[in-house]
């Protein structure tokens, strides 16, 4: 993807209650400005299958330093989590919400990624339907719910296929 750094979700947690967060990792030796990135999501059962419901921008001028992470945490998370957060939001997954790291501008109306108006860099879940309480991950039933997912150390970029990412 021209202009996009290979950022990806390095950690995703649905720790019960509001102890939810995700981490985006910058595997490069450059500081990455997040102005052209966003995290788009659907809540459980999507309104339109395959299309995001909310497009969430990072604060203008937000960056991820080289080989560092940017943490987005739920507004009501435990203080320990909030102290690590670069951004807070009430729109974090409870395990059954599809989350994508995207590069590009927000379309005027929610649009399928095949439109070419933005690029998916990585997934936690997908926007293709209600998974119940969560998606299965590496043989763990509903692994995105009430678990913390940590990417393997040798992963250096996101995966545009949730099926591949989930193992």
Please report, for each region that a protein language model flagged, where it lies by residue.
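Extracellular low-complexity, O-glycosylation-prone Ser/Thr/Pro/Gly-rich "stalks"
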Residues: 140-167
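Activation on beta-sandwich/Ig-like modules and their edge loops
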Residues: 2-146
